[in-house]
Amino acid sequence: MPQWFTSKSDPEDTRIQETLKSSCVLPRHIGIIMDGNGRWAKIKGKSRIAGHVAGVESVRDVVEASSQLGIENLTLFTFSIENWKRPKPEISALMKLLIKVLRKEAVKLLENDIRLEVIGDMEMIPDDVRKTLDETIELTRKNRGMAMTIALSYSGKWDITQACRHIALQVKQGLLDPETIDENLFASYLSTASMPDPDLLIRTSGEYRISNFMLWQNAYSEIIFSNTLWPDFRRNELYEAIREFQKRERRFGKTSEQLKTNEVE
């Protein structure tokens, strides 16, 4: 398995990154639904876990490129709550792979000023995986570069439900006035409270859905659907998605004329 942050300096890649930085504003937060490992493996005549192993190289390249670009937040949809319904041998192999990758790359994350975070229902995560996650999070918690968040045992419906449950409990205990509940307060109870909403959401493998990922947070995200299967996704596809993002006009419910007026003011 290749190590992270060992790519040789490429003048052309550096030029592309500098062009992206100077062309227009970069997304502060990129979310990626990494899909297509199983189909990639089937096409290659390999096992599904071989597809997941191949996908690790894509993670490495995208994390490295995002960090080099100065992206503040990168969230990778790694494993959904619904994925617990998959065959147990596949789940076990995935969890072992996650532990192996975290242990192998933790020091690289530390050295490259990347902070690891995780969102999801941790009660469903096996103890050995939680222990490895906790160790890596603690190791990198003082880093101030890019925040790389793993969405593990996560679903948008779960996130909204757990926020509602916590708010309802505080109202019941008399600690929260229902009249003070607004969008900002609600968002502060989501698992993503410490990060901005995604500006750009990328979904690989040619599927056109967001698969229960950050349902609240993606309200105004620009969504790019890539036909590339995740194990074949590399920084060039990431750059192309960012170029497309930079071409789009983000109106947030306003008209183009209103945005132009605000720019003049």
Curated annotation (Swiss-Prot):
Keywords: Magnesium, Metal-binding, Transferase
Name the UniProt record assigns to this protein: Isoprenyl transferase
Biological processes, Gene Ontology terms: polyprenol biosynthetic process
InterPro entries: UPP_synth-like, UPP_synth-like_CS, UPP_synth-like_sf
Organism: Chlorobaculum tepidum (strain ATCC 49652 / DSM 12025 / NBRC 103806 / TLS) (Chlorobium tepidum)
Enzyme Commission numbers on file: 2.5.1.-
Primary role: Catalyzes the condensation of isopentenyl diphosphate (IPP) with allylic pyrophosphates generating different type of terpenoids.
Enzyme class name: transferase
